[in-house]
């Protein structure tokens, strides 16, 4: 079922003129999709409650650094089938069905979101108040019709609370005015958590005994890069020269860090290189010692990395390597 859903999403994204990455296994995301300045990090799950805390944290952190929209596409929750046209949320990440995602890409955003107690909608509180006062309808009258308290109506008008879908429809019908607003699931800034500190990330790496990885990340950090260490992605770290409001102008290096090189490492590095090209970024494989030169991958030994002065020097090194392989 998951494989079918993944295939359908790939077809949909191609039809919608997105450039997409190859699917990943055992990662916090399955696909990266890009069109113009819109980027998606997509996780496909049959049961959206199977997303782990660790996966969600990493997905959010990568999305924030790449200025991308993290989204889960699934079919059910732990207890029930997911409703079409409704937005769910897990660990701050929006989750929808395939059909709801397709409608969003077609310009038809969902209007209902799932929360404890049922399904709710966002309404325009200012329009609600203006219309009620214009029609000379008291708060008490509207509360009685809606079967909620007067206090709740005041909260709706101040945008301090949202009604259930059922209550919103009653209010709309009584006032004869549209109040329900669509939910923008492509707002990448909404709900994104802050990244973990380097100290927290190092603690995890230390527990896993990855001394070589720590050495490389320390060197990159000393150069002046902002760093995000990963354990649930096809790359080991994302190094960012500086934060830019424009995703296209970010100098980002997707970094794989391995003591020894083998066929599996090369395959993963080539996939990461494809991601970097898709996102107008860079990729780098750092090894204990370089073996055979692979012209398709930008790689260097840790001793070479230690000789690099700063972020500018490393980016120039990568650019020079790219040009030499063309």
Swiss-Prot record:
GO terms for molecular function: DNA binding; DNA-binding transcription factor activity. InterPro entries: Arc_TR_HTH, Cro/C1-type_HTH, Lambda_DNA-bd_dom_sf. Coiled coil: none annotated. The keyword Cytoplasm does not apply. PROSITE patterns: HTH_CROC1. Keywords: DNA-binding, Transcription, Transcription regulation. Residues 128-183 form the HTH cro/C1-type domain. It comes from the Archaea. This is Putative HTH-type transcriptional regulatory protein MmarC7_1702. Pfam families: HTH_3. It comes from Methanococcus maripaludis (strain C7 / ATCC BAA-1331).
């Amino acid at each position: 079922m998951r494989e079918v859903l993944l295939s359908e999403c790939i077809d949909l994204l191609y039809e919608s003129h997105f450039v997409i990455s190859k699917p990943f296994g055992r990662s916090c995301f399955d696909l990266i999709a890009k069109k113009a300045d819109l980027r998606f990090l997509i996780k496909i799950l049959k049961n959206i409650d199977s997303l782990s805390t660790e996966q969600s944290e990493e997905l959010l952190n990568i999305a924030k650094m790449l200025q991308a929209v993290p989204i889960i596409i699934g079919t059910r929750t732990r207890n029930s089938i997911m409703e079409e046209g409704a937005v769910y949320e897990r660990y701050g990440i929006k989750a929808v069905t395939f059909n709801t995602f397709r409608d969003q890409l077609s310009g038809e955003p969902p209007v209902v979101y799932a929360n404890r107690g049922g399904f709710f909608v966002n309404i325009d509180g200012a329009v609600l108040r203006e219309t009620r006062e214009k029609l000379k309808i008291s708060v008490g009258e509207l509360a009685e019709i809606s079967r909620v308290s007067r206090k709740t109506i005041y909260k709706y008008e101040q945008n301090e609370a949202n009604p259930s879908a059922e209550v919103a429809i009653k209010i709309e019908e009584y006032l004869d005015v549209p109040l329900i607003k669509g939910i923008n699931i492509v707002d990448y800034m909404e709900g994104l958590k802050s990244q973990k500190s380097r100290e927290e990330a190092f603690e995890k790496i230390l527990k896993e005994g990855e001394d070589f990885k720590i050495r490389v990340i320390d060197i990159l950090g000393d150069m002046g890069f902002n760093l995000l260490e990963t354990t649930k992605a096809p790359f080991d770290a994302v190094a960012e020269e500086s934060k830019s409001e424009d995703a296209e102008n970010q100098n980002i290096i997707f970094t794989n860090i391995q003591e020894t090189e083998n066929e599996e490492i090369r395959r993963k590095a080539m996939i990461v290189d494809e991601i970097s090209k898709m996102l107008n970024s860079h990729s780098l494989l750092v090894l204990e010692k370089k073996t055979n030169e692979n012209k398709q991958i930008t790689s260097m030994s840790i001793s070479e990395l230690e000789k690099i002065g700063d972020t500018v020097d490393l980016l120039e090194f990568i650019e020079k390597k790219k040009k030499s392989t063309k």
